[in-house]
Regions:
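A generic hydrophobic-segment detector
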Residues: 131-181
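Bacterial Sec-dependent N-terminal signal peptides
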Residues: 1-37, 181
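Short glycine/proline- and aromatic-enriched beta-strand/turn motifs that initiate or cap beta-hairpins
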Residues: 30-79, 83, 170, 174, ...
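A generic structural signal for short coil/turn motifs at secondary-structure boundaries
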Residues: 48-50, 82, 123-126, 160-164
Length: 181
């Protein structure tokens, strides 16, 4: 058997400690979860620039990890309107994404929070524009019932994977409704 060098020894010990820590944290995470599901439907877009106007119809299916923390899987049906050098064009895309959000302020009638997200059309053949997006959004949920309207404002960066369209960053607004199960 080969003798480990000092660095290899430290790496193996660190791995062992991380695995042990992970195994100890699993019960804490499992029993501290709120364990409810959530659905969100929203429309988001921007009309601030004449050169680029993206609009997305979003459907999120998620899980409330705690009262404040949630994770969502997102599907978007997106259309982007372009006007470059006087030529108008559009691109239609289907996007799959993941969001992670945190509610900062809880009250009976209002929740205020923030979420970050990433999405990609994963090189789908039926998408005109191939891109990844990164977004950050502040939102408010209003009302006391299970179905709550949501209003949001955020920033999104489109990382284009084609030569036909360039990378873009926009400020967007969203409106929709959410259901907590």
């Amino acid at each position: 058997m080969r003798k480990l060098s000092y660095v290899e020894f430290l790496v193996s010990k660190t791995r062992q400690r991380l695995v042990l820590l992970f195994l100890l944290l699993i019960p804490i995470a499992a029993f501290s979860q709120k364990g409810t599901f959530r659905t969100l439907m929203q429309i988001q877009g921007t009309g601030l620039t004449k050169e680029f106007k993206p609009y997305e119809l979003c459907c999120d299916l998620g899980y409330n990890i705690t009262d404040n923390l949630y994770a969502d899987l997102r599907y978007e049906n997106a259309i982007a309107l372009f006007k470059e050098n006087g030529v108008k064009d559009y691109a239609h895309s289907h996007i799959v994404g993941l969001n992670l959000g945190y509610v900062v302020y809880h009250s009976e009638n209002c929740n205020i929070g923030a979420q970050i997200g990433y999405g990609s059309n994963m090189k789908r053949k039926n998408s005109d524009w191939k891109y990844d997006y990164y977004e950050a959004m502040a939102f408010t949920d209003l009302g006391t019932c299970k179905i709550k309207p949501r209003f949001g404002l955020g920033v999104r960066h489109y990382n284009s994977r084609t030569n036909h369209y360039k990378d873009r960053t926009v400020i967007f607004a969203s409106i929709g409704f959410g259901i907590n199960w």
